[in-house]
């Protein structure tokens, strides 16, 4: 579960290294987000020469979460870290590579480009 002020690692090569969640999108009173949800973030750490800079406000989709997600068959999937991929308004990633595994739930939310770039889909 990601909420306001949560910090996430960035799982792409857009130039950002760490994000701070500003807002969870999808409803007026929505407090938490999980895998596959879009959030608004501020870039807290960035690498020099990247596409995004420190202080930029970006949209990101959550690809890994410490608090797992329950699947229809009753199983749960949890990850060791909270991670997100920076996306444009049309749900395409701003980076050209994805690092680490991503959850299968992204396919249900129409993030096919992220799923195809990921080295492993769990």
UniProtKB/Swiss-Prot annotation:
<protein>
    <recommendedName>
        <fullName>Large ribosomal subunit protein uL14</fullName>
    </recommendedName>
</protein>
<keyword id="KW-0687">Ribonucleoprotein</keyword>
<dbReference type="Pfam" id="PF00238">
    <property type="entry name" value="Ribosomal_L14"/>
</dbReference>
<dbReference type="InterPro" id="IPR036853">
    <property type="entry name" value="Ribosomal_uL14_sf"/>
</dbReference>
<dbReference type="GO" id="GO:0022625">
    <property type="term" value="C:cytosolic large ribosomal subunit"/>
</dbReference>
<comment type="function">
    <text>Binds to 23S rRNA. Forms part of two intersubunit bridges in the 70S ribosome.</text>
</comment>
<comment type="similarity">
    <text>Belongs to the universal ribosomal protein uL14 family.</text>
</comment>
<comment type="subunit">
    <text>Part of the 50S ribosomal subunit. Forms a cluster with proteins L3 and L19. In the 70S ribosome, L14 and L19 interact and together make contacts with the 16S rRNA in bridges B5 and B8.</text>
</comment>
<keyword id="KW-0699">rRNA-binding</keyword>
<dbReference type="GO" id="GO:0006412">
    <property type="term" value="P:translation"/>
</dbReference>
<dbReference type="GO" id="GO:0003735">
    <property type="term" value="F:structural constituent of ribosome"/>
</dbReference>
<dbReference type="InterPro" id="IPR019972">
    <property type="entry name" value="Ribosomal_uL14_CS"/>
</dbReference>
<keyword id="KW-0694">RNA-binding</keyword>
<dbReference type="InterPro" id="IPR000218">
    <property type="entry name" value="Ribosomal_uL14"/>
</dbReference>
<dbReference type="InterPro" id="IPR005745">
    <property type="entry name" value="Ribosomal_uL14_bac-type"/>
</dbReference>
<keyword id="KW-0689">Ribosomal protein</keyword>
<dbReference type="GO" id="GO:0070180">
    <property type="term" value="F:large ribosomal subunit rRNA binding"/>
</dbReference>
